[in-house]
Design a protein with these regions (language model features):
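Post-Walker A helix-loop "phosphate-sensing" segment adjacent to the P-loop in P-loop NTPases
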Residues: 76-88, 115-118
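Conserved catalytic segments around the Walker B and adjacent sensor/switch elements
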Residues: 56-58, 81-98
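A short, basic N-terminal segment
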Residues: 1-55, 77-80
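Hydrophobic helix-cap positions at the C-terminus of alpha-helices
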Residues: 44-48, 78, 82, 139-140, ...
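Acidic, polar-rich N-terminal leader regions of halophilic archaeal proteins
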Residues: 25-30, 63, 92, 152, ...
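Walker A/P-loop nucleotide-binding motif
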Residues: 52-75, 98
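Mid-core helix/loop region of P-loop NTP-binding domains shared across ATPases and GTPases
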Residues: 2-17, 54, 71, 90, ...
Length: 240
């Protein structure tokens, strides 16, 4: 059998300790230069650990400003602390670039609340939207606690299908209170600082109870981030 083209490469040591930390999809455990934004968001969301309803929020900033990474980090910490102290907090992250209709968002939220042994998925299509919403409310109350719905790229969703979904989600606590004890807040993440111009004033006032602006990283901050990623992802002395 002839020589395999990979034979000589396998004998070479890898440059990487952990290549995953260099990928765009990596969720870092440390977020340099975002302390101010983390402080503002956690100050609001800590209310969930006290059994209260956090304010709805919108996070603004250009692509690459760390909005998604910061939100995922905080929600992971929030959920972990809730388990530690016996408070049910249920964050759900929705990518509205791919899940981009009212039906699909509601179905995704509802199905995210199923336990591992439950198989009653809301179908990808086929139900009236009102029925999907009712099922979501029922499942949220069955799960209990405080639900944190994160709508990433919310500006894309609004521009495509309007603000009916946001109206329903911003008013969902009224439906939850009538039928149980669960509560909910909504966090929107937007690349467009002006996307709220597309919203009905009633939706705008309820969704934007608190705003957090993520400024772009400057050159020094980007250098710090790259050096941090390289330090944990690439073997020492591999770069010169």
């Amino acid at each position: 059998m002839g020589e395999n083209i990979f034979d000589n490469l396998l004998s070479h040591p890898s440059l990487f300790v952990n290549k995953e930390v260099l990928r765009h999809s990596h969720h870092p455990s440390e977020l340099p230069h975002r302390n101010k934004e983390i402080k503002a968001i956690r100050f609001n969301l800590v209310e969930a650990l006290k059994g209260q309803i956090p304010s709805n929020m919108v996070l603004y900033g250009v692509t690459g400003a760390g909005k998604t990474a910061v939100t995922r980090f905080i929600c992971s910490q929030l959920e972990g602390k809730g388990k530690q102290i016996g408070k049910s907090v249920n964050p759900v992250h929705v990518n509205c670039r791919t899940i981009d209709t009212q039906y699909r968002v509601l179905a995704f939220l509802g199905n995210s609340l199923l336990k591992d042994n439950e198989k009653e998925d809301i179908p990808f299509t086929g139900w009236p939207t009102d029925r999907v919403f009712e099922e979501l409310v029922k499942r949220m109350n069955e799960r209990g606690g405080v639900h944190v719905i994160v709508l990433d790229e919310i500006d894309h969703l609004v521009k495509k299908v309007g603000d009916d979904l946001l109206y329903n989600l911003c008013n969902i606590n009224d439906d939850l209170k009538r039928r149980g004890q669960a509560r909910c807040c909504v966090i929107g993440i937007s690349n467009d600082l002006k996307f709220t111009e597309y919203l009905d004033p009633r939706v705008k006032s309820r969704l934007g109870q608190e705003d957090v602006i993520f400024s772009p990283y400057d050159a020094v901050q980007l250098k710090d981030i790259l050096e941090y990623r390289a330090e944990i992802g690439i073997k020492t002395n591999s770069l010169s």
